[in-house]
């Protein structure tokens, strides 16, 4: 069944779904995708204008033969390996068939000598393919042959072979210190001195890359398959693109029976060659129909040396699933008109998605594409199920693809943080804001972090300031913060507490430690502003004339008001029971439509610190 392209916007492909119980197509997108997903494209492309470059709509789909259908079973096994411990019931919900994204493009190419390919590439740059992630210079089987086979084919060249005697003389001079005709042999002392001059402390002076060149190559694991063709297809699938020569112009000898596949109609061997891939608009053209620059190239080659292997060939460029970017795959998979989830947060090896309700029927399909297109950096894809409501600010996450490990390592501001997203809170989007806050600290400061989490601010500040006092209510966060302080060798510069934020403020400022605190950070946007009431009366047991210093407080909060700065300022004044509070307000980021995250910085007012309106704290 063929759908009309005029109904679809560019680069958006509706995917009908094939049920595992029926082979009929379902034209309307079903809310829950099943088993294998296939594309339907229009066969009438002449009336549609496509942008330059490759597209899933422009290429031809290869015909699925028996071997390619058999490879789908390998895809299913590979899928099981990628999703780790997922149940088979989950796997049956959706399986993306990567073969459906293979596209074949018919193009033309010029076969040129390998030694001239880079110069010719610069000369013909405007007439070459110039597709993203596709090199204009391509290699195919048969462009290089071993020397023994070249002699068998009878190479015609004017270049003289290197004299074997000169090679022997060079070896003798290197090993024995002399060669025939050099006169007397060097003494052992002079020979060692001569060799020593070619060395330095790092190895060979004249051959600095000798150690790298001499290093043995890595052994690659080869898959064992029953048939050679299956092995060839499996190796191709690991590549983004493959170029094959389909047809050459002119009569030539066929060496396929002698040398095997890939060494077909090549004529007499004239040396190493490469392919210069021409623009797709020149596909199927003869030499006389090509641009003048290319015709001049052929004319110059013919006049200079008739033995040069300049010839126009017809090629087949195959682009596999790995070539297409994530956005294009998702646009093809999701129904027409649906917003493509293109952005996600990275926490170590974990990709954190925030999918809309319309994406939920396709969540595992989306997660697989995200995992495939971002490996090996991404090994786990999760989605937040519900908004954050608990006191520990931990998120309810659902693992959609990859392994189930939510313990990861995050590097920020040159520090390493071990986090477990299932038990602690972490937001990579606030990395820039944390860095901005740290720029306001100096070596004379003493920092008190009331809601420290796993320590992104506290540990980073410990490298700058005199002392850091960090606290968090979540015992798991405290455990990870202690571990991170040891990992980053900062355990001697930070003191960690596990208690409620209000009680921590009261206990800290009622002790001698609180007298030295110059900076207070309260990064808990949901409740931090309301926790400011804990500062009322913190200096009641001291005299007003002691010359006390009052800390600068940095408090974060959310606001959905039309004027978020005014709303947040009012909440701060209400919590402190003080009207005259000079606050520096700053918008941090837009969390959701109409919801801002803000940062307010102010010096603790003297009237608040000596207020007699003490609160009674309840366990």
Swiss-Prot record:
GO terms for molecular function: tRNA (guanine(37)-N1)-methyltransferase activity. S-adenosyl-L-methionine binds at residues 434, 472-473, 500-501, 523. Residues 1-10 form a transit peptide. InterPro entries: MeTrfase_TRM5/TYW2, SAM-dependent_MTases_sf, TRM5-TYW2-like_MTfase, TRM5/TYW2-like_N, tRNA_Gua_MeTrfase_euk. GO terms for biological process: tRNA methylation. GO terms for cellular component: mitochondrial matrix; nucleus. Keywords: Cytoplasm, Methyltransferase, Mitochondrion, Nucleus, S-adenosyl-L-methionine, Transferase, Transit peptide, tRNA processing. It catalyses: guanosine(37) in tRNA + S-adenosyl-L-methionine = N(1)-methylguanosine(37) in tRNA + S-adenosyl-L-homocysteine + H(+). Its EC number is 2.1.1.228. It is found in: Mitochondrion matrix; Nucleus; Cytoplasm. The keyword S-adenosyl-L-methionine applies. Its main location: mitochondrion. Gene3D superfamilies: Met-10+ protein-like domains (3.30.300.110), Vaccinia Virus protein VP39 (3.40.50.150). Monomer. HAMAP family: TRM5 (MF_03152). Belongs to the class I-like SAM-binding methyltransferase superfamily. TRM5/TYW2 family. Specifically methylates the N1 position of guanosine-37 in various cytoplasmic and mitochondrial tRNAs. Methylation is not dependent on the nature of the nucleoside 5' of the target nucleoside. This is the first step in the biosynthesis of wybutosine (yW), a modified base adjacent to the anticodon of tRNAs and required for accurate decoding. This is tRNA (guanine(37)-N(1))-methyltransferase 2. It comes from Arabidopsis thaliana (Mouse-ear cress).
């Amino acid at each position: 069944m063929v759908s009309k392209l005029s109904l679809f916007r560019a680069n958006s492909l509706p995917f009908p779904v094939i049920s595992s119980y029926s082979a009929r197509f379902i034209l309307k997108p079903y809310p829950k995708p099943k088993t294998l997903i296939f594309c339907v494209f229009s066969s009438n492309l002449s009336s549609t204008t496509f942008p330059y470059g490759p597209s899933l709509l422009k290429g031809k789909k290869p015909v699925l033969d028996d071997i390619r259908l058999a490879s789908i079973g390998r895809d299913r096994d590979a899928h099981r390996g990628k999703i780790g411990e997922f149940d088979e019931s989950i796997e049956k919900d959706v399986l993306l068939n990567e073969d459906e994204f293979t596209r074949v493009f018919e193009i033309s190419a010029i076969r040129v000598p390998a030694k001239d390919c880079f110069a010719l590439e610069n000369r013909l740059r405007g007439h070459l393919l110039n597709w993203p992630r596709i090199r204009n210079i391509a290699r195919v089987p048969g462009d290089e042959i071993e020397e023994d086979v070249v002699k068998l084919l009878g190479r015609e060249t004017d270049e003289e072979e290197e004299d074997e005697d000169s090679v022997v003389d060079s070896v003798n001079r290197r090993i024995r210190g002399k060669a025939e005709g050099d006169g007397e042999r060097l003494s052992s002392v002079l020979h060692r001195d001569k060799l020593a001059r070619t060395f330095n402390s790092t190895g060979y002076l004249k051959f600095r890359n000798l150690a790298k060149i001499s290093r043995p190559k890595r052994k690659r694991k080869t898959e064992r398959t029953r048939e050679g063709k299956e092995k060839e297809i499996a190796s191709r699938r690991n590549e983004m693109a493959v170029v094959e020569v389909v047809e050459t112009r002119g009569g030539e000898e066929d060496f396929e029976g002698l040398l095997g596949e890939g060494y077909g109609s090549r004529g007499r061997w004239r040396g190493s060659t490469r392919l210069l891939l021409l623009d797709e608009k020149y596909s199927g053209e003869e030499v006389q129909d090509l641009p003048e620059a290319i015709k001049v190239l052929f004319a110059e080659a013919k006049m200079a040396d008739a033995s040069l292997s300049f010839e126009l060939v017809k090629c087949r460029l195959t682009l596999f699933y790995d070539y297409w970017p994530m956005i294009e795959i998702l646009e093809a998979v999701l129904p027409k008109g649906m917003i493509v989830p293109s952005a996600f947060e990275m926490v170590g090896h974990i990709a954190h998605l925030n999918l809309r309700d319309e994406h939920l029927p396709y969540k595992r399909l989306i997660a697989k594409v995200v995992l495939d297109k971002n490996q090996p950096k991404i090994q786990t894809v999760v989605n937040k199920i519900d908004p954050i409501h608990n006191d520990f600010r931990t998120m309810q996450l659902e693992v959609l693809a990859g392994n189930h490990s939510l313990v990861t390592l995050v590097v920020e501001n040159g520090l390493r943080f071990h986090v477990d997203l299932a038990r602690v809170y972490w937001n990579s989007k606030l990395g820039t804001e944390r860095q901005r806050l740290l720029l306001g600290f100096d070596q004379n400061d003493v920092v008190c972090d009331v809601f420290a989490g796993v320590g992104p601010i506290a540990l980073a500040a410990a490298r700058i300031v005199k002392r850091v006092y960090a606290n968090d209510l979540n015992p798991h966060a405290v455990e990870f913060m202690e571990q991170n302080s040891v990992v980053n060798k900062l355990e001697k510069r930070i003191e960690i507490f596990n208690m409620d934020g209000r009680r921590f403020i009261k206990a800290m400022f009622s002790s001698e430690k609180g007298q030295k605190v110059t900076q207070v950070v309260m990064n808990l946007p949901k409740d931090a502003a309301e926790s400011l009431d804990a500062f009322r009366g913190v200096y009641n047991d001291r005299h007003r004339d002691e010359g006390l210093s009052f800390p600068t407080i940095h408090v974060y909060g959310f606001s959905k008001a039309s004027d978020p700065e005014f709303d947040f300022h009012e909440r701060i004044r209400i919590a402190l029971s003080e009207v005259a509070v000079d606050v520096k307000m700053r918008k941090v980021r837009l969390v959701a439509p109409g919801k801002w995250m803000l940062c307010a910085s102010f010096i603790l007012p003297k009237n608040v610190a000596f207020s007699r309106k003490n609160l009674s704290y309840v366990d």
